C-alpha cells in the first residue's frame, strides 16, 4: 500500500505526493527447504511403489511440482518417470 504525504505537489495541481519509501521493494528471503526424499535411495523411487508415488500426486492424479513438494530436481525427474510408468501399467489413475 502506498502512503500519501499531506503536502501538495509544488506545481499546485492539487495531487498529493507519495512517499519515496513506498517505492522500495521488500527484501526477498528464500527459504531453504530440505528434500523429503534425501534419505531415500534412488532404487526406492520405483513405479511399483504406489504408496510413495501417491504422496507426490494430487487428488486428481496430477504430478505435484517440486516448488510445492520441495523435492530436488533429480528426484523430481525420477518421480515423474515413475508416475508415468505406473499410469501406463494402470497402477495409478490418469484422472
From Swiss-Prot:
Swiss-Prot/TrEMBL keywords: Ribonucleoprotein, Ribosomal protein, RNA-binding, rRNA-binding
GO molecular function: small ribosomal subunit rRNA binding; structural constituent of ribosome
Gene Ontology biological-process entries: translation
Keyword Ribosomal protein: yes
Single GO cellular component term: cytosolic small ribosomal subunit
Keyword Nucleotide-binding annotated: no
Coiled-coil zones: none
Pfam family membership, one: Ribosomal_S18
InterPro entries in alphabetical order: Ribosomal_bS18, Ribosomal_bS18_sf
Assembly mode: Part of the 30S ribosomal subunit. Forms a tight heterodimer with protein bS6.
Family affiliation: Belongs to the bacterial ribosomal protein bS18 family.
Job description of the protein: Binds as a heterodimer with protein bS6 to the central domain of the 16S rRNA, where it helps stabilize the platform of the 30S subunit.
Classification via NCBIfam families: S18
Protein name per UniProt: Small ribosomal subunit protein bS18
Amino acid at each position: 500500500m502506498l502512503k500519501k504525504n499531506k503536502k501538495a505537489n509544488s506545481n499546485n495541481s492539487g495531487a498529493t505526493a507519495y512517499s519515496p519509501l513506498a517505492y522500495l521493494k521488500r527484501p526477498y528471503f528464500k527459504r531453504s527447504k530440505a528434500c523429503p526424499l534425501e534419505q531415500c535411495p534412488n532404487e526406492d523411487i520405483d513405479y511399483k511403489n504406489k504408496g510413495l508415488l501417491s504422496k507426490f500426486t494430487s487428488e486428481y492424479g496430477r504430478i505435484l511440482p517440486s516448488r510445492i513438494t520441495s523435492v530436488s530436481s533429480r528426484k523430481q525427474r525420477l518421480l515423474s518417470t515413475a508416475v508415468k510408468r505406473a499410469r501406463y501399467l494402470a497402477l495409478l489413475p490418469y484422472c
